[in-house]
């Protein structure tokens, strides 16, 4: 799905990977670009707008842990431009010391945002179809002992995305669901692995993981922008050490209705 002339929302667009992806997306000649974030960075929004005057950039102060904030922000988009064509769910934290906050931001907030946006995008309701890209992690595909809580939240994102990305739903709504899994990337989130791990026992392996080779956020952001345009329902992609690769998950069980 080309993004030219489309209306796009990026939740968490002012983070490191998110902002790099935003810069890439601004080259796509979108009609409008809505950046939802708890961070307030007016200079970054101005810089985005300067990249392409053809795309109208909006900033919305956004609390992903609040259903009312989610509902109000999405309603504002529809009131301004009528249609939502693409939603990127990119808000996330890594702090295993706070289980509730990790789950509320990384998983529950993502679920609530998706479920609120989907009817607005559904071609049989208010929308014209589109794509939802949920940002999980390589730690949503494989376990990571020093970040067990973060890992659980991202496994949840993976399970949710694969479930609502079933062809049954896509054929009805016209909304594709794609999952994007960054590997270790040079961001403050990655640095938290070395200090906000699950147990005290985790310190040694956390430090070892923190010293693993990483990729630049610019590279990961470019990969994310590429995945948004793929519009491949059910697609799962890993961005790791500078390479973007599609993932085919192992299937151990299938529901009988398939």
Swiss-Prot record:
Homodimer. NAD(+) binds at residues 9-33. Substrate binds at residue 137. The active site is at 150 (proton acceptor). Its EC number is 1.1.1.1. Belongs to the short-chain dehydrogenases/reductases (SDR) family. CDD domains: ADH_SDR_c_like (cd05323). Keywords: NAD, Oxidoreductase. The gene is ADH2. It is an enzyme of class 1 (oxidoreductase). It comes from Ceratitis cosyra (Mango fruit fly). This is Alcohol dehydrogenase 2. It holds the Pfam family adh_short. It catalyses: a primary alcohol + NAD(+) = an aldehyde + NADH + H(+); a secondary alcohol + NAD(+) = a ketone + NADH + H(+). GO terms for cellular component: cytoplasm. GO terms for molecular function: alcohol dehydrogenase (NAD+) activity. The keyword Transmembrane helix does not apply.
